[in-house]
């Protein structure tokens, strides 16, 4: 069986590297910043978690189905082109989703300072009008001073004369029957004394009573102020607007993921089979570096463009539309490259029950069961970082350029760490690598919970590279040692797709509600404790499991065996005799 006669191996690898590079740039344009954009739409943490959980769930189970159905050359080519072409339009659907509050305040494009309500309070939309601090306050009646508490700004204790807006969960605010007073707040920032109290921001609130319209909506103000327990207040936003934004966002994200999820797996399967026909699969293993390089360049490039083009392209709606426009442009470039992507014409026969067999292999080995459980847990915890870390950084004053740079540091760290893979595997073993990865991830989460400045996230990103790479190195080594012949890729896809993806989905669903009920700092501290407890349990169980000894027949057969001597000394050095004696002694 020969490879596609129109392709030589060097040209095929060149196109594959370019495709991975462009796809990395494409993914980096939107994926790290999607939850930040959803927050700017006015969606609270539970709804953002639900959206991301749905996205991960579709990716975990829809991609293998499409890869199973697309086996022929024509189907794979059509799926690659259709996925990229459809994702161009699907990504632009997110730009059309209206925010919960269309009258919300945006950051001004003229360089002056401003405040966005959804940027200040995760899970809360405060429809307030921000006015300049230099305005004369004499023309505003009923003026009094109030303090708005935001994450990252500490409220000084003992000042009972100031009102603090807490637990403003818009999506849970019940409508109050009867007469109500609707107030429009004009907030004037008071910046005096910020040197002594840098975490305290005081606003002058001017309340003007407005007549109440039927249904409880005041003119020009979408929020109704209703009393809650203590001094907490809730703004009763239109549930219809919230429901509309959430449903449109859910539909757009789900449709978008249905189109994009199969792309990576189908492309990888096609390239691997193409190289397998010419016995060049060893060159397939280095292609992941090009995707990470593309993501590193893309995440820095798109954040630089956002600051320059966002105000030029946007007149209304939330910031961040440049991410989706950039994604569409790079997807078009990837579409052009995909036309030349190597796909074998001759179909390689593979049993259709590989996934089921891979699952049975995992279920029959206690070491793989522990590794699968660890992968699910890590996926759940990593999803909380991916979903809400940028929220945490935003609350501490970080811009998107700093956020992109933090992602690039982590990705470049993974590339620089790769040459040490063999050394770490030899020194630490698979269990040691898992322990190293879990420890680094726990320390990383604990550090995130105590962020203090806009730049403070950058030094810890090296641990992100170690924690991510260490886990997948351990998975790869376990698959290589314990998998039966020609089941390595199926087992690896099971860990990366089903187990890790299911964990990300579960973590997204749960994480949003934890953020709503407590805070991001509490979420990260709880995840840190969970990781340390699981690490202790993992090490205690691992010691009690029988020590497996698998003969790597594929490696043994590749060794050059000298048969020039039939002496007893030659027999003692024979690799097959050694392997049989080791197996018999165990």
Curated annotation (Swiss-Prot):
Listed transmembrane segments: 50-70, 78-98, 246-266, 287-307, 326-346, 361-381, 400-420, 433-455, 456-476, 499-519, 521-541
Location in the cell: Membrane
Gene Ontology CC: membrane
UniProt region (Disordered), positions on chain: 133-160
InterPro entries associated with the record: MFS_assoc_dom, MFS_MFSD6, MFS_trans_sf
Assigned keywords, A-Z: Membrane, Transmembrane, Transmembrane helix
Principal subcellular localization: membrane
CDD domains named in the record: MFS_MFSD6L (cd17479)
Domain of life: Eukaryota
Topology in membrane: Multi-pass membrane protein
Family of the protein in this entry: Belongs to the major facilitator superfamily. MFSD6 family.
Name of the featured protein: Major facilitator superfamily domain-containing protein 6-like
């Amino acid at each position: 069986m020969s490879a596609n006669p129109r392709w030589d191996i060097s040209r095929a690898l060149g196109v594959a590297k370019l495709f991975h590079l462009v796809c990395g740039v494409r993914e980096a344009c939107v994926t790290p910043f999607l939850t930040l954009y959803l927050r700017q739409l006015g969606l609270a943490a539970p709804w953002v978690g639900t959206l991301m959980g749905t996205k991960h769930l579709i990716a975990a189970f829809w991609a293998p189905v499409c890869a199973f159905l697309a086996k022929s050359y024509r189907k794979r080519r059509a799926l690659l082109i259709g996925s990229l072409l459809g994702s161009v339009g699907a990504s632009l659907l997110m730009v059309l989703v209206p925010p919960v509050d269309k009258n919300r305040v945006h950051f001004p494009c003229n360089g002056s300072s401003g405040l966005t309500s959804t940027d200040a309070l995760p899970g809360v939309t405060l429809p307030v009008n921000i006015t300049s601090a230099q305005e004369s306050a004499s023309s505003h009646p009923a003026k009094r001073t109030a303090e708005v508490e935001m994450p990252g700004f500490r409220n000084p204790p003992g000042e009972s004369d100031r009102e603090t807006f807490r637990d403003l969960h818009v999506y849970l605010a019940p409508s109050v029957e009867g007469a109500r007073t609707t107030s429009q707040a004009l907030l004037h920032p008071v910046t005096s004394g910020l040197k002594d109290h840098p975490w305290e921001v005081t606003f002058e609130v001017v309340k003007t009573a407005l007549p109440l319209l039927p249904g409880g909506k005041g003119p020009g103000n979408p929020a109704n102020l209703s009393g809650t327990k203590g001094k907490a207040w809730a703004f009763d936003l239109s549930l219809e607007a919230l429901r509309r934004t959430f449903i449109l966002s859910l539909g757009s994200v789900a449709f978008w993921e249905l189109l994009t999820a199969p792309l990576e797996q189908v492309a990888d399967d096609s390239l691997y089979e193409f190289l397998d026909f010419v016995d060049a699969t060893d060159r397939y293993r280095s292609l992941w570096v090009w995707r990470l390089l593309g993501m590193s360049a893309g995440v820095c490039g798109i954040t630089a463009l956002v600051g320059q083009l966002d105000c030029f392209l946007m007149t209304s709606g939330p910031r961040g539309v440049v991410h989706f426009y950039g994604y569409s442009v790079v997807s078009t470039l990837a579409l052009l490259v995909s036309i030349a992507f190597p796909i074998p014409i001759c179909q390689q026969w593979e049993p259709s029950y590989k996934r089921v067999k891979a699952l049975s292999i995992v279920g029959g080995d206690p070491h793989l069961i522990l590794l699968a459980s660890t992968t699910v847990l890590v996926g759940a915890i990593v999803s909380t970082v991916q979903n809400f870390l940028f929220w945490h950084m935003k609350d501490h004053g970080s811009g998107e350029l700093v956020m992109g740079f933090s992602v690039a540091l982590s990705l470049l760290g993974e590339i620089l760490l790769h040459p040490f893979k063999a050394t770490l595997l030899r020194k630490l073993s698979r269990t040691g690598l898992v322990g190293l990865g879990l420890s680094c991830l726990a320390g990383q989460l604990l550090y995130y919970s105590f962020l203090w400045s806009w730049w403070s996230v950058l030094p810890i990103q090296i641990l992100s590279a170690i924690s991510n790479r260490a886990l997948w190195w351990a998975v790869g080594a376990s698959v290589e040692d314990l998998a039966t012949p020609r089941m390595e890729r199926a087992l690896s896809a099971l860990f990366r797709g089903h187990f890790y993806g299911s964990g990300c989905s579960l973590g997204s669903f749960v994480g949003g509600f934890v953020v709503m009920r407590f805070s991001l700092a509490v979420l990260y501290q709880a995840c840190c404790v969970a990781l340390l407890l699981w690490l202790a349990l993992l090490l205690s169980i691992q010691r009690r499991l029988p020590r497996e000894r698998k003969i790597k027949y594929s490696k043994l057969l590749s060794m050059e065996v000298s048969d020039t001597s039939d002496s007893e000394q030659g027999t003692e050095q024979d690799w097959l005799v050694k392997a049989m004696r080791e197996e018999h002694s165990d």
